[in-house]
Amino acid sequence: MRETSSREDTNNIGKAPEMSGGTIMDTMTSLPHQNDQNVIRHLTNLVKSPASGDDDIKKKEDSIMELGNILAQNKQTEELRNMIEQTRPFLVSLGKAKAAKLVRDLVDLCLKIDDQDGDIKVGLVKECIQWATEQNRTFLRQTLTARLVRLYNDLQRYTQALPLAADLIRELKKVDDKDVLVEVELEESKAYYNLSNIGRARASLTGARTTANAIYVNPRMQAALDLQSGILHAADEKDFKTAFSYFYEAFEGYDSVDEKVSALTALKYMLLCKVMLDLPDEVNSLLSAKLALKYNGSDLDAMKAIAAAAQKRSLKDFQVAFGSFPQELQMDPVVRKHFHSLSERMLEKDLCRIIEPYSFVQIEHVAQQIGIDRSKVEKKLSQMILDQKLSGSLDQGEGMLIVFEIAVPDEAYQTALDTIHAMGEVVDALYSNASKIN
């Protein structure tokens, strides 16, 4: 952003860090006698004042964004919504691209304010879409509609997101707007995934990746595509090794643009993959890596608790961890979808740990040790034997599990067989050569 001159009474208002006078917020840190309300009044006057000339227009744009940031930080939702409406006459005088960016940024600021009713957020975006339609600003309408699709996903209104996304995708393909198309196809994939339609989710993601290959995609969007790819690989094919690779790419991408919340989510899913790959001992080493050291929080604590339970092969510790971190585990849609698999794996690990010392063991004793119903234990042991995860048999009459000793293969025997086979091939070759000579 180019450096602009400023009036003495505005203290160099602007967003760009390159500006010599700094922003109002920068000035506030050195003027403790002022407060946010003074800044808001000052910026509001600038926003309401008429602008003539390029310098005035530039200052007014910066003032609008700075006022929006302050109102958002103070969670003054109503004031921010009013400001969006009041700036519309000024927006009409701007170029379409510049006005579209300003509106999108202000809407994003408003939507990021916590403790808002979902219907109020939806109403704001729809109102802005209506204004863009009336002003015949097609690009702005399309980008705001894309933002509405994402908002529906954020509010878990997936059935409302899908038809809106489908209509917008058809429209964007006609005008060949690939930037917005990638975003909408990605959101469509997320909606299908959360509705458990993995096939359609994968098709939408494939479309988004195909579109992205034809254009430059910023690191944030590339990271979002990688994150969704990892989620689908883990959900569809249970391919946690490939999923881990995608999550790692997403983590690096988000970290490079300082998207800490999204980077933390990708790191959390990386740890989930390690647990699902039966490598819980690698969780701590992963967290001690240089790139991950600056991240911490309850999400990582939850995954460390799950990994510790997996290392101890304790179903009880696993259940305690899941109960101790409801927001981080039970409310996470990705972790929740793998909860059943995780539970079954932990049950199998705990059963193996309990029966490990025995050749014969009562099923009732195993059930008491693990703390679940005997019939469920018996059913699970039968399944493990059929799946060849356990070498043994059930004596249901006596209520006993007979564990077979797994014979360790004799390496010398196999080596001898290989040697005899090789010698046979040599003898055959010699016989063939001798026959040709004769």
From Swiss-Prot:
Residues 1-10 have a biased composition (Basic and acidic residues). This is Probable 26S proteasome regulatory subunit rpn-6.1. One of its GO terms (biological process) is determination of adult lifespan. Induction: By daf-16. Component of the lid subcomplex of the 19S proteasome regulatory particle complex (also named PA700 complex). The 26S proteasome consists of a 20S proteasome core and two 19S regulatory subunits. Residues 1-30 are annotated as: Disordered. It comes from the Eukaryota. SMART domains: PAM, PINT. Disulfide bonds: none annotated. Disruption phenotype: Embryonic lethal, larval arrest. It comes from Caenorhabditis elegans. Gene3D superfamilies: 1.25.40.570. GO terms for molecular function: structural molecule activity. PANTHER family: 26S PROTEASOME NON-ATPASE REGULATORY SUBUNIT 11/COP9 SIGNALOSOME COMPLEX SUBUNIT 2 (PTHR10678). The keyword Acetylation does not apply. Residues 239-408 form the PCI domain. Keywords: Proteasome. The keyword Plastid does not apply. One of its GO terms (cellular component) is proteasome regulatory particle, lid subcomplex. Component of the lid subcomplex of the 26S proteasome, a multiprotein complex involved in the ATP-dependent degradation of ubiquitinated proteins. In the complex, rpn-6.1 is required for proteasome assembly. Plays a key role in increased proteasome activity in response to proteotoxic stress: induced by daf-16, promoting enhanced assembly of the 26S proteasome and higher proteasome activity, leading to extended lifespan. The gene is rpn-6.1. Belongs to the proteasome subunit S9 family.
